[in-house]
Amino acid sequence: MKIRVAVSQLSLAALSAVLFFGITPAFAQQHAGGAPHWSYSGPDGPEHWGDLDPSYASCKTGQRQSPIDIKDAEPADLKPIQFDYKLSPMKIVNNGHTILVKYEPGSSITVDGKQYPLVQFHFHHPSEEEINGQKSDMVLHFVHVSADGHAIAIAVLLKSGGENPLIRDIWAHIPKEVDKEVEFKKVVINAADLLPADQNYYTFDGSLTIPPCSDVKWFVMKTPVELSPAQIAAFAKLYPDNARPIQATNGRKIQESNFTE
């Protein structure tokens, strides 16, 4: 089942801001003197998001908020996600909340016969999701949105290990200036290189993990991908903690796939 992003809260332009640029409408307006800023600590931190702006209300009142601690998952007859990630020039921005890579149109996933184009991916340190109470060193979120406004997020847990070549390239091109998008046309990447070989997953109904915390369908890959301790440290120097705290499950069903390829 796909969960429709709350269009009552988000105009098409605002949805594009959240999913494509990795910022909220309020954050965009803040730069024009509008709605309040949010952060990961202090008076505008996660425990206060729902009170910062009426459009953030779901952060406080939503019953299917993310991230969650994934446990007691039910085995289910689920099909593999069909990934069709292609090459893209690197477009990267340090938006003040994370490092975000915007993706060239033409890449997508297919879930239950429906196509969801990939619009961006970004990183959190430590992981926002937990598996049986355990966090990973980091997590990568791929954000997809269909033509009719349904959103799917795919989380790939990142653990300390060998150096990751694609992350090395991304880190080497992080802009020094916040909120300045930089395109490196001669640097071509493929997001498929950040996927685990085993693509079994957990899936559940959830939300964006940043304001306005609107509904999103989540797929969390069961197998992590490695990056080096130095690569983790480099990101942590920029963002020591850009992870929303764990949210209540509120009786949500969590399913897990167990297919063999």
State what each model feature region is.
Residues 1-11:
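Bacterial Sec-dependent N-terminal signal peptides
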Residues 2-4, 24-261:
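Alpha-carbonic anhydrase
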